[in-house]
Amino acid sequence: MEYKKVAFALGKDKPKLTIDYTQVDFADAPARLAFIDSKLFGVPFQGYDYYLDGKGGMKGVLAKLFQLFNQTGEQMDKADLVTYLAEIVFLPEALLQDFVSFTQIDAHTVEARISCNSVSASGVFRFDDACEMICFSTNERGQTASDGSVEEIPWEAQCDAYKLYSDGIKRPTIFRAVWKYPEEDFIYFDGSISSVDGAEVRR
């Protein structure tokens, strides 16, 4: 899945960037790779976000030489597992795997649970009257700062503007990631999807 010119922020009080974002998700096991390409104060900045073999992490490098952060550990393992769950609607074949389960709450709400290597996480999907997923919310994705500290903030992934792609599948064209602070919502990722598995939005 590819995004172009995403509005992105490294933190609530951190610089805002415009990034290109490319990610690959896998269906046979919870796994994802994501690459960020941008500039920070005019200097090339790359980021790498991953969840592989039950381990998650995020690394940021400036000028291809200087490591700004390298976040790993149990909190990142769970955070990236939750991220995979939030994005699972883009990978329908993963919905049928044994590592994920669903419980319907009502006509518009489904609770989802995912497990990998003894780590479990859950969240709630909400759907509109057209059965389109509009958001995924969870209290199980801690916010890890660049210094490694963790703050427990409700997190939400939002999907919007569903359109047909060139492969005939209707998908969201807008994806946002939001921290739900008590005083305000902080959207740190606000992107338009340019393609999914090579399929582009029909014009």
Give the positions of each predicted feature.
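Short, solvent-exposed coil/turn segments at beta-strand boundaries
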Residues: 21-33, 47-59, 105-108, 126-134, ...
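Residues that act as N-cap/strand-start positions at coil-to-secondary-structure junctions
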Residues: 13-18, 96, 106-108, 119, ...
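Gly/Pro-enriched, hydrophobic low-complexity segments
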Residues: 113-200
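Short beta-strand segments that buttress and anchor functional surface loops
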Residues: 2-10, 32-39, 110-117, 138, ...
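N-terminal mature ectodomain segment of secretory-pathway/periplasmic proteins
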Residues: 1-67
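Flexible, processing/modification-adjacent segments and terminal tails
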Residues: 61-118
